Amino acid sequence: ERTHTGEKPFECQECHKRFTRDHHLKTHMRLHTGERPYRCEHCDRQFVQVANLRRHLRVHTGERPYGCEHCSMK
């Protein structure tokens, strides 16, 4: 429902950015606290969001999921 109403009841007390979901605020707060709970097991880099860790892991696996639309290169 909040998508359509524009309601954002969860506000960051540091920068006053507002969010529709409490877990979005919790993830955002890591930017202010410096918490990086997701660590790469290969090189020890740390990330705020698990999606960023998953994208980073491609560096180690060599995975290149996106191909060029004009040639066969990835």
UniProtKB/Swiss-Prot annotation:
Main subcellular localisation: nucleus
Keyword Cell cycle appears in the UniProt entry: no
ZnF start-end (C2H2-type): 1-4, 10-32, 38-60, 66-74
Keywords associated with the record: Developmental protein, DNA-binding, Gap protein, Metal-binding, Nucleus, Repeat, Zinc, Zinc-finger
Keyword Nucleus: yes
PROSITE patterns for this protein: ZINC_FINGER_C2H2_1, ZINC_FINGER_C2H2_2
Example GO biological process: segmentation
InterPro entries for this protein: Zinc_finger (IPR050331), Znf_C2H2_sf (IPR036236), Znf_C2H2_type (IPR013087)
PANTHER family assigned: PR DOMAIN ZINC FINGER PROTEIN, ZINC FINGER PROTEIN 154-LIKE
Sequence similarity: Belongs to the krueppel C2H2-type zinc-finger protein family.
Chain's role: Krueppel is a gap class segmentation protein.
Protein name (Swiss-Prot/TrEMBL): Protein krueppel
